[in-house]
Amino acid sequence: MTQTVLRIDSSLSGDASRSRVATAQITQNQQPERVIHRDLATDPLPFIDADWAAARLVPEADRTEAQKDALALSDTLISEMRDADTLVIALPVHNFGMPASLKAWVDLIARPGVTFRYTENGPIGLFEGKKAIIVYASGGTPLGASYDYASGHLRQVLNFVGIKDVQIVDTKEQAVAA
């Protein structure tokens, strides 16, 4: 049994979404004590900007109030990840890649010194010991096709921040028992 699941939906199709139905079922199958649900379609995230990029490089103790404000949402998203044992992430494919709303989430959680750190031997992810289930949904881009730029990208991001246990469920196969 999983204690906490972070469920991330990003499909614009509402209740008709295959990925949304699958993330709900997979989350339920995990029998979590707690679910954190982040719906990027109904509550979209802003894109990172120059203020955010500059603030993330300032040591926490030296940040101004404006810099803290610029990072506040990012801090919240990272806290949601930190609290979760398992991430269940819907990945509806748009034009061969992830939707912009999910890419905004990726950009906001990928923070040096917070979710990963650089070493002389390369980057090290700081979120080890977590599991992720990616729920892949596409009307025309088969999972693993040479032009599937979505699943490999999201898997790489998760690996980069230390989440190595990544399973991909293809909604075309209706295998939602994960």
Give the label of every model feature segment.
Residues 143-178:
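Glycine-rich phosphate/pyrophosphate-binding loop and the adjoining helix
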Residues 1-91, 96-107, 111, 176:
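N-terminal beta1-alpha1-beta2 submodule of the flavodoxin-like/Rossmannoid cofactor-binding fold
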Residues 109-125:
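Short, acidic/small-residue loops that bind anionic groups at enzyme active sites
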Residues 87, 132-133:
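Short, well-ordered beta-strand core segments
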Residues 3-4, 34, 130-132, 164-165:
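Residues at the starts of beta-strands that form the adenosine-phosphate
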Residues 123-129, 161:
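Short, conserved loop/helix-junction motifs that constitute active-site signature segments
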Residues 12-14, 139-142:
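Short histidine/acidic/glycine/proline-rich micro-motifs that form metal-
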